[in-house]
A protein has these predicted regions:
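Acidic Gly/Asp/Thr-rich repetitive segments characteristic of extracellular carbohydrate-active
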Residues: 4-37
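A general structural motif
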Residues: 2, 30-32, 78, 484
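Long, low-complexity intrinsically disordered regions enriched in small/polar
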Residues: 497-569
Length: 569
């Protein structure tokens, strides 16, 4: 049978004046008890030593238990607290030392301390409650939070460490100075929650943790929306991140699964995988990223299957030794490159569509920089659809370019391999090699070029096999300077000015065309570079006129006036 006790600040027949008095009597009897507390303020510390239920009979907020310093409630036995306001300073306001503790429709105000601290082996449930300023800490304990509000925590709003397990459902977390939810060596599930205005990552999985996030909204955070580091695992499903510095970040060996998420208005990056981070990302949407929608760097190695990027600066950037595989990619309406692979990075892109971007794929770096694209369409590109520079290697298979300045180009010492690719409606040409680059194209089709079909200059090498070059306004192919190569089994058709213009260093075996084929040396190389050495002032070794010079200045203003006689001053 459950014993019943009444507490009233005014006292009364069979009523206790303090809650501690009622708790003491319940502990002495050793029976389950219900303690009904009348409205009022109770400046005392409570210790639960037997199974008990504390109820504010006047409803939530009618009973305020406050201590100027130290703990307010220490629970050492199964307990339920309903409707109380617990206010403490400089200590754990609520501590669960043994058994299970449930707080319902309650409010906890923690000034310079922990709001709720669950010790190893205990269990705490927080339901329909509010926590101000302090944090909910599980150290080797189990916790469940339902429909609660956490506001202005001085550090982490909720933290689970040392093998603890936390479930947070349908709650709101706002204004935390550090993280909204922190997991360090434990497990956490965050579902149906809103997290906003956190000073660091809203949800963060630390070393060897497991984090599951589903159906959440993360907005207006100073750092990452969701972060996984140090070999942590877990998943993120159907979650939206808005106005974070980075939407989702993965680093240092972490390997989450992310599905059906939307990352909007991220100030730096949408997805950031770096420092050996991995991860599998499926059906992700990134819009309006301030710097890069998807960034992979410093050994990051994600797998992305289904990603739509719209608006913002750059699309996918794989740099500094990063690597990744990207499938079912859509990139639209950017102000910079759709795909970028630099500095010993490797990337494979399959089933790609790029629309209305300044450039498609850009690669640059040493010989360890490699990119592959298969089954792609790049259209309405302002500059080059594909550009390979440095010593990078690029392989394109079944890539179609529609309406671009240049379809495929390689310069410096880069290598570009084309298989069954096509270009239509280009301005300058279909494929280009310059510098000392090498371009090999098999099964290439170029149609409707306002310039050339293919061309090479400098000392580059251009090899074209089985190509169809149709309706190119200037000509099918041009080899200028000391460039070399071959046109094998190729056809040049249409009403262009020339079929082929070459320098005599090209193998034309199997060329089919009715247009003129002209051998002529064409030079495009610039003149010698002139180097001026300025020491304390300019040194003139010949006549100089019409020149303005300034040195040893931080700021200079130049004005030029044309006189009536045509002279300038």
């Amino acid at each position: 049978m459950v014993a019943r006790y009444v507490v009233s600040p005014r006292g009364g027949r069979r009523a206790h004046r303090t809650i501690a008095s009622a708790l003491g009597e319940a502990a002495r009897r050793g029976r389950p008890a219900v303690i009904e507390i009348e409205p009022g303020g109770y400046p005392e510390a409570l210790t639960v030593r037997s199974e008990v239920r504390l109820v504010a009979v006047g409803g939530p907020g009618s009973v305020v238990v406050e201590q100027p310093r130290g703990a307010v409630l220490d629970s050492c036995a199964p307990a339920v607290v309903e409707g109380l306001v617990l206010v403490g300073r400089h200590a754990d306001v609520v501590g669960c030392h043994a058994g299970a503790l449930t707080l319902e429709r309650s409010e906890i105000r923690a000034y310079d301390g922990v709001a709720v601290h669950a010790r190893p082996g205990t269990s705490v449930t927080l339901r329909d409650s509010t926590v101000l300023h302090g944090r909910f800490l599980l150290a080797g304990a189990h916790g469940r939070v339902e429909r609660c509000r956490f506001t202005d925590a001085a550090d982490n709003a909720l933290a689970v460490i040392d093998g603890g397990h936390l479930e947070v459902l349908g709650s709101r977390i706002e204004g935390s100075r550090i993280h909204g939810v922190f997991v360090g060596g434990g497990r956490a599930r965050v579902e149906g929650c809103t997290l906003t205005r956190t000073g660091m990552a809203a949800v963060f999985a630390g070393a060897r943790s497991e984090l599951v996030v589903a159906d959440c909204l993360v907005e207006s955070v100073e750092a990452e929306g969701i972060g996984f580091v140090e070999q942590s695992r877990g998943s993120v499903d159907r979650t939206r991140v808005v106005d974070a510095r980075c939407g989702i970040a993965v680093a240092s060996g972490a390997d989450p699964v992310v599905r059906d998420c939307v990352l909007t208005g991220c100030r730096d990056t949408g997805l950031d995988v770096n420092g050996g981070g991995r991860g599998r990302f499926r059906d992700i949407e990134v819009s309006g990223a301030g710097n890069v929608a998807v960034l992979v760097t410093r050994g990051g190695a994600p797998e992305v299957d289904g990603c739509r990027v719209t608006g913002g600066t750059a699309g996918f950037a794989v740099t500094d030794g990063g690597r990744g595989r990207f499938t079912r990619i859509e990139v639209r309406d950017l102000t910079s490159a759709a795909l970028r692979v630099h500095d010993e990075a490797t990337a494979v892109f399959e089933h790609v569509r790029v629309e209305r971007c300044p450039s498609g794929l850009e690669t640059k770096g040493n010989g360890g920089t490699r990119a592959e694209i298969g089954d792609a369409v790049l259209c309405d590109v302002e500059m080059a659809a594909v550009t390979a520079l440095g010593q990078s290697w690029v392989t394109l298979r079944r890539v179609a370019v529609e309406r671009a300045a240049l379809a495929f180009g390689a310069g410096e010492e880069a290598q570009l391999l084309l298989e069954d690719c096509r270009a239509a409606g280009v301005g300058v040409g279909g494929a280009s090699a310059f510098g000392t680059a090498r371009v090999v194209a098999r099964g290439l089709t170029v149609s409707g070029s306002d310039g050339l079909g293919v061309f090479a200059r400098d000392t580059a090498r251009l090899e074209v096999v089985g190509a169809v070059l149709a309706d190119c306004a200037v000509g099918g192919a041009t080899f200028a300077d000391r460039s070399v190569g071959r046109l094998a089994d190729c056809s040049v058709t249409g009403e262009g000015q020339l079929g082929v213009l070459h320098n005599g260093l090209v193998d034309l075996g199997g060329l089919r065309t009715t247009l003129p084929v002209v051998e002529k040396e064409v030079r495009t190389e610039p003149g010698p570079t002139v180097v001026h050495h300025h020491y304390e002032g300019p040194v003139f070794n010949g006549p100089v006129r019409d020149v303005q010079l300034a040195w040893n200045n931080i700021h200079a203003v130049q004005n030029r006036t044309t006189n009536e006689d045509g002279t300038r001053t």
